[in-house]
Amino acid sequence: MTQRSILAGKNPTVIIKAGANITVRGYESDLVSAETSGVGGLQIEKRGKSEVGRARAAIGDHVLFDVRLNLPKWKGKNTPEEVIEVQMGGSGQVLVPFGSNLKVYAGTDIDVQGVQGQVDAYAGLKLSLQDVYCLGYASSGGKMEIDCQTMSEKEVKFEAGSDLRFHVRDLTSARIRVRDLGGYWEARIGDGEKSVYLKSGGDVTLVTDQKVEALPPNYVLGRIERPAAS
């Protein structure tokens, strides 16, 4: 088991790149701590924003992802001059301060819980964001499960290769467009001030405690559930 830690402060920007599965948990600390049992190695370091390049993970000759890393522009904040970058060739776990802002890339699965900043996540297979404050951008090649407090943008699009479960707790005024295995449907919550497009290779489940109104031309609604009682 390889382990590394670095002093990061209470609200760091952390970029995590893993060749396989990655689990991320928020905790009460000013350290970013990572561990992996894989043979692909582990690196953790502070980098200037001008140094951050491509996120690339591969298994053999098969490239899982190869994308340019653009640092997110956090609302009300300047782009940080330094970021913490964690890289591992295989699977592992990363602990980050509760207030972290994250960009996470993984060749297979991503599981993030208990983060009070913004999270952007790109998974080759499954993606799960639970008890996250702010949802940025997200995509997955397989199943996606989202449970966040708010979103960073007013117009968003999320795509999953399989089932997509979507719950944003403060979504009280939005126009929802969904395309999944059952076809296309459109609905409105409140005054429809935000725009949310959900595209899935499986079934989409919209989780909300708000009234959902079906819209023309078909006045069809898909799968809608109320959140579980806390």
Language-model features: where?
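Intrinsically disordered, low-complexity terminal regions
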Residues: 1-230
